[in-house]
């Protein structure tokens, strides 16, 4: 059984390939530059928006959602939007509430972890969790690991709790349970043993850490066809911000919602718009894979890429220097920021 939901998703209709006269006259689209207008009025399907710093990508994402709803291309319950921070999610909800005459309550807008929490709360039994499961923050997780190590006489100098917490988080970001982790020596085997004990402790105590929110949610979608298909039908329009900062598991989670593997090939459905900037990828130390952007283009057969290159924050001398420096990166997807603000001091 699925939770009651007044929205079953948007009709599988195509948005016009460009804004017509009536759409262009909409107050929603006022003051957008040509690049922003093209991004907001993209046809249904999969697209990549390369959004440089200060290019108004938050405005584009929010206006895109409002435009879809205003023109009847989506219902609130058919939209899922992923932001990088809780602050960005709250800002998006506030903007949409001000822009639209309808309630935005049916939309799923939040961070990966926030959305996974919502999904697991709705399907806690299928996920093997207590209805009232608690979430461990970073400090709570460290305390739990310290307590575990003390109970099992783990040498905390040889296996510092902070390093164990990092190891467990990394395993989960890679989608690995203890049985999936390669062990090449005694230290590796010991860390996997602690990982297993930690999972058992969390399950007994009815708690999950941030990594578990993501991994358990992914496994729920992967292993439960009716639940996965329900949300695939529902979310006809998905928008993901800061795509360059997604990790392996987050991208895999998105694919579960967006399509299925058929004959060894991924077949995506609905409309997924990824917004990101490979020049701003700074979270590799936390598992972020800038390569997810190229994988998205290939696996989702992306036919439309739009570059937001108009910068509204900086002077031209700053942008010229930044463009010159980043041009040495031969693996970037490529864009050049520009401004109308002049050279500055």
Segments from the language model and where they lie:
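P-loop NTPase Walker
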Residues: 1-131, 135, 229, 280, ...
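Conserved helicase NTPase motor core
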Residues: 30-41, 45-50, 60-61, 80-81, ...
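Short, flexible turn/loop "capping" segments at secondary-structure junctions
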Residues: 41, 72-73, 274, 298-301, ...
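Phosphate/oxyanion-binding loops and surfaces in catalytic or ligand/nucleic-acid-binding neighborhoods
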Residues: 99, 122, 126, 151-155, ...
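A short helix-to-beta-strand connector/capping loop
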Residues: 102-107, 304, 344-345
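N-terminal helical cap/lid subdomain that shapes the substrate entry/recognition surface
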Residues: 115, 303-304
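Coupling/switch/interface segments within P-loop NTPase motor domains and analogous charged loops
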Residues: 138-205
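Coupling/hinge elements of helicase-like and P-loop NTPase modules
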Residues: 156-166, 306-345
